[in-house]
């Protein structure tokens, strides 16, 4: 028993001594946690350098865009071919991707050798050889009669400008075929395939083996957004935000970046951790000074590193009693498979002895222990370096997503990772230590990167088909110049129709006289009350105007109008308004005051004078009973009487559009048009009295409230009316009415978007084909969400957050489509508004007999003010359709309430002038 203990002690002491000896000798190969964190930081900096346009040309880590923009979503199906060229043999596959939802893949494959004379010979011969092998495979599998898409896995650094193209930057590993560098490998292979007249194959995608690995794993796990290969060579790819990729135009969505991390350190960034053995290995390689990171990591080099170390130790008398065999002097005699065998847990020492004996050496027990530890240090350093670079990628992903914890999957492949008994465990452990804020799953790519190339091709086919479907829907909202000119002409005709006495009663564009006959001239003065009713909020204002200084001071208070009041009785609505006025007067210390009042009433009214307005019909969600056909000024007066607390002199009832024009007209006498683009949509303008047949008198001008929201109610714009507009119209409070407003105003745009999203989801193009309860809910898409989603400053991640707030769980690709839909709907709205406005400015130019008209438009409304693109598109449309009109757009900063007070002040001024005359 004692002897056994003695032997165990002796062996353990021997092992300890040998390990210490090797540790001392290879001190520089052992990397501390601090060193790994430093390498991680350096790699982050190299990634940034590679992504930036200015620094990419000199970057060692090239960060190549792959033009792979989406990962599989499970809806892919069909038959695809795949080629994998990049190692000691290449593979051809036929991949059958199952019908939707089943995520099942069937594969048939065949390996072909890549002889040295082919991979180091002439480039044309290489591609002809590959094409011959593909033809052989198709003949064997009876595929010659089929037209099939093909994905090419090409495991060498390529610069791509599209998915189906790749210019070889440099050969790596053992490949050295002449005349291929700086040429498009897809074109070269396509040309070689043309020699086979009976083969009909389209190369749809060129991918790196790393990208193929990521796509293979992503088919099984949608969280997979990183691919890593640790085999003959080493590389990594990951999904980067487009907004960070300077080399590719556009900032929507994500794209897979092939890091080509094997070249990390080629610019000297890793000199402090490279050892004499790394330098010696590099000098003896096919590409000295290149792929320095790869030479410290990959399977092509680990065995050689071990050989160089053993040779040096033997020369120093630290191994084999100082004896060296000719095999130990021979390059390539120790391979990575030997390193893996020597590190096996139980039989490792026995394997070590056997391998060393095969090398012509006579190892002692101590030698075997030492050699095994050399292998451990070399392979552990490899895993550590890989872990540091991968941790940098994971940190970048987490920061891109702006999350505290990242959940992600890394697709893994490569012979070193697969065959080495300790490698995966070591890599995983170090990664988790370096990035504790990331929950990482490592998924082995069972089918290799070739299946991934087929998956990229399948995704490309799916995306192509889906893109066509989405484009068909969006095309309905893309108006041509001819269509806009047609809308302009029809609006012009409807304006004329509404002005004529004979046709006025039947006109859909009402062209209502407002009896506002003058603009402010700067002499107005006094205190005025103004009411502003037109949306879910109601404002009461006290406006103080000072003569001669164009100075206005305003005090206002906003009151809510509950839905039950909006849709209750007329008496309840006006009693609520008077209650709000009483509260305001009390608040301002004006209880019992008698002041002139202007009433901004943003609904279509027929007026017989400036202080009389008969409601034609409610819009914007109001439905109060017993109001339509009644004079709203009388209804307000009666409500004031019922309260019997104060008396007000109601001087003017005006539309919000007129109020907007007057507010801007106070600042700019050239302002003769008012436009509201908000909850509703409307326009007013100063018309020559001679053209207004419903009002007597031919001198001067009068403001006409067009009520253009009703344009199209007679079917004149049915050619641009879509099925989605019909859905929105039928679900509205006033079906068949206000059709132009329903295509252009903030109240309806979000609802049009929702209808499109439902349709696209039904077609399986969005939200994984699942229509959530939230998406079925009318009104969830408020215009403010459209404005936020379309903001240029908003990254897709924030768009996804907005959609999540709306209860819609979207992918990155979904977010892009939602943004496109919002853009198409709001663009059409702005263009239609622009076409309508162009009709009015052209009419004013022609009426005045001018070659060129200069005019100002006063504008208000949340859509115009808050939407990031609406105002620009509207202005561009007006410029294009009315080139002889110089139109200035002036934002009404104080809303239509100030305008009502100004109209009241102007009316008072004109009344006073009449009295004096």
Curated annotation (Swiss-Prot):
Domain of life, source organism: Eukaryota
Hexokinase domain location: 16-458, 464-905
GO term, biological process aspect, one: glucose metabolic process
UniProt-annotated binding residues for D-glucose 6-phosphate 1: 84-91, 209, 232, 413-415, 449
Enzyme Commission designation: 2.7.1.1
Catalysed reactions listed for this entry: a D-hexose + ATP = a D-hexose 6-phosphate + ADP + H(+); D-glucose + ATP = D-glucose 6-phosphate + ADP + H(+)
Annotated Gene Ontology cellular component terms: cytoplasm; cytosol; mitochondrial membrane; mitochondrion; photoreceptor inner segment
Similarity remark: Belongs to the hexokinase family.
Protein's name according to its UniProt entry: Hexokinase HKDC1
């Amino acid at each position: 028993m004692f002897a056994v203990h003695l032997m165990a002690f002796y062996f353990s002491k021997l092992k300890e001594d040998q390990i210490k000896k090797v540790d001392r000798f290879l001190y520089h190969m052992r990397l501390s946690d601090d060193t790994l964190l430093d390498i991680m930081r350096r790699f982050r900096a190299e990634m940034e350098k590679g992504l930036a346009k200015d620094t990419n040309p000199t970057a060692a880590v090239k960060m190549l865009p792959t033009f792979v923009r989406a990962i599989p979503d499970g809806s892919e199906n069909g038959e695809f071919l795949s080629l994998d060229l990049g190692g000691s043999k290449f593979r051809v596959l036929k991949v059958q991707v199952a019908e939707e939802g089943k995520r099942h893949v069937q594969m048939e494959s065949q390996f072909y050798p890549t002889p040295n004379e082919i991979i180091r010979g002439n480039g044309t011969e290489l591609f002809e050889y590959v094409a011959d092998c593909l033809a052989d495979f198709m003949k064997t599998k009876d595929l010659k009669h089929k037209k099939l898409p093909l994905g090419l896995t090409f495991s060498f650094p390529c610069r791509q400008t599209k998915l189906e193209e790749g210019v070889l930057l440099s050969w790596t590993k053992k490949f050295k075929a002449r005349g291929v560098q700086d040429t498009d490998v897809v074109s070269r292979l396509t040309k070689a395939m043309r020699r086979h007249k009976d083969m009909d194959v389209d190369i749809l995608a060129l991918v790196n083996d790393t990208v193929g690995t990521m796509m293979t794993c992503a088919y099984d796990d949608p969280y997979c957004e990183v691919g890593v290969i640790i085999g003959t060579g080493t590389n990594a790819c990951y999904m980067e935000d487009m907004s960070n990729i300077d080399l590719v135009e556009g900032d929507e969505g994500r794209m897979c970046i092939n890091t080509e991390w094997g070249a990390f350190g080629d610019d000297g960034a890793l000199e402090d951790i490279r050892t004499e053995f790394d330098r010696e290995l590099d000098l003896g390689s096919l590409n000295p000074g290149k792929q320095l990171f790869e030479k410290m990591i990959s399977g092509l080099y680990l065995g050689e590193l071990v050989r160089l170390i053993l040779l040096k130790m033997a020369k120093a008398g630290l191994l084999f009693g100082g004896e060296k065999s000719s095999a130990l002097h021979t390059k390539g005699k120790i391979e990575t498979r030997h390193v893996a065998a020597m590190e096996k847990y139980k039989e490792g020492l026995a394997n070590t002895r056997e391998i060393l004996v095969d090398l012509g050496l006579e190892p002692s027990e101590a030698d075997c222990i030492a050699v095994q530890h050399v292998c451990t240090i070399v392979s552990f350093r490899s895993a550590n370096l890989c872990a540091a670079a991968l941790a940098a990628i994971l940190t970048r992903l987490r920061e891109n997503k702006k999350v505290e914890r990242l959940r992600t999957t890394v697709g893994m492949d490569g012979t070193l990772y697969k065959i080495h008994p300790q490698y995966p465990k070591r890599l995983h452990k170090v990664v988790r230590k370096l990035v504790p804020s990331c929950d990482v799953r490592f998924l082995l790519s069972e089918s290799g990167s070739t299946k991934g190339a087929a998956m990229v091709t399948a995704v490309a086919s799916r995306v192509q088909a889906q893109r066509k479907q989405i484009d068909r829907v969006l095309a309905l909202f893309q108006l041509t110049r001819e269509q806009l000119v047609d809308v302009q002409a029809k609006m012009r005709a409807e304006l004329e129709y509404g002005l004529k006495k004979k046709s006025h009663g039947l006109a859909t564009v009402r062209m209502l006289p407002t009896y506002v006959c003058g603009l402010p001239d700067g002499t107005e003065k006094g205190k005025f009350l103004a009411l502003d009713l037109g949306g879910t909020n109601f404002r009461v204002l006290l406006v103080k105007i000072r003569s001669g200084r164009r100075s206005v001071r305003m005090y206002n208070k906003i009151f809510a109008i509950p839905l039950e009041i909006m849709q209750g009785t007329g008496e309840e609505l006006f009693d609520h308004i008077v209650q709000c006025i009483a509260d305001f007067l009390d608040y301002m210390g004006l209880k019992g005051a008698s002041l002139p009042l202007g009433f901004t009433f943003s609904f279509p009214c027929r007026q017989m004078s400036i202080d009389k307005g008969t409601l034609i019909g409610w819009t914007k969600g109001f439905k109060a009973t017993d109001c339509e056909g009644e004079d709203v000024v009388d209804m307000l007066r009666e409500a004031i009487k019922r309260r019997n607390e104060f008396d007000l002199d109601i001087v003017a009832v005006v539309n919000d559009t007129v109020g907007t024009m007057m507010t801007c007209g106070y600042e700019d006498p050239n302002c003769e048009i008012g436009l509201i683009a908000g909850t509703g949509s409307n326009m007013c303008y100063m018309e020559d009295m001679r053209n207004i047949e419903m009002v007597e008198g031919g001198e001067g001008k009068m403001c006409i409230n067009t009520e253009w929201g009703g344009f199209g109610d007679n079917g004149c714009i049915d050619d641009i009316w879509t099925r989605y507009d019909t859905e929105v119209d039928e679900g509205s409070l006033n079906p068949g009415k206000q059709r132009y407003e329903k295509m252009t105003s903030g109240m309806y745009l979000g609802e049009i978007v929702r209808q499109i999203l439902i349709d696209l989801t039904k077609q399986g193009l969005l939200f994984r084909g699942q229509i959530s309860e939230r998406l079925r809910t009318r009104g969830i898409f408020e215009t403010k969400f459209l404005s936020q989603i379309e903001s240029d400053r908003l990254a897709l991640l924030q768009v996804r957050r907005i959609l999540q707030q709306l209860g819609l769980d979207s992918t990155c690709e979904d977010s892009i489509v939602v943004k496109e839909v919002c853009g198409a709907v709001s663009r059409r709205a702005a263009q239609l508004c622009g076409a309508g406005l162009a009709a009015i400015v052209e009419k004013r130019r022609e009426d005045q007999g001018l070659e060129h008209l200069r005019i100002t438009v006063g504008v208000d409304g949340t859509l115009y003010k808050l939407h990031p693109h609406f105002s620009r598109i509207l202005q561009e449309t007006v410029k294009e359709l009315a080139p002889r009109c110089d139109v200035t757009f002036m934002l009404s900063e104080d809303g239509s309430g100030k305008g009502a007070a100004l109209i009241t002040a102007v009316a008072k001024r004109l009344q006073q002038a009449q009295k004096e005359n």
